[in-house]
Amino acid sequence: MEKFLKPNKAVILLQGKYAGRKAVIVRAFDEGTRDRPYGHCLVAGISRYPKKVIRKDSAKKAGKKSRVKAFIKLVNYNHIMPTRYTLDEDLKDVVKDVVNADVLQARDKKVTARRTKARLAERFKTGKNRWFFTKLRF
């Protein structure tokens, strides 16, 4: 069977705190690991989407509305829905030191999420991957 859950593939999370949020696969663990003996992947996604900016908004308000908040998480394959989209932004170097689950603890996770946030915010401001930065309507 061909592996289609590859890095840079956009997915939608189906379960948990970030259900309904869009994310991108950073690294896939098809065979599982010792801690998680099932197929899972490391995803980086958007926990708070940027709001729509209108013409009459001041520069300060427009800046606040275009903020992006990111997260990183290990997710079971059963809890994601792949989409046809891919992000050409490679986030692998942002989370290069993430090899196992114990690296994803509170402090390191926050630092990595902050670096991911900066990368995604830059992507949003350039106007690329517009679909990824819009809230999913359902």
Curated annotation (Swiss-Prot):
Name the InterPro entries on file. Answer: Ribosomal_eL27 (IPR001141), Ribosomal_eL27_CS (IPR018262), Ribosomal_eL27_KOW (IPR041991), Ribosomal_eL27_sf (IPR038655), Translation_prot_SH3-like_sf (IPR008991)
Q: Which GO terms describe its cellular component?
A: cytosolic large ribosomal subunit
Q: Cite the Pfam families for this sequence.
A: Ribosomal_L27e
CDD domains given for it? KOW_RPL27
Q: Which UniProt keywords apply?
A: Ribonucleoprotein, Ribosomal protein
| Gene Ontology process terms (BP) | translation
**Record keyword Ribonucleoprotein present:** yes
A Gene Ontology molecular function term for this protein is: structural constituent of ribosome
The regions listed as transmembrane in this protein's record are none
Q: Which family does it belong to?
A: Belongs to the eukaryotic ribosomal protein eL27 family.
The name on file for this protein is Large ribosomal subunit protein eL27
Natural source organism: Solanum tuberosum
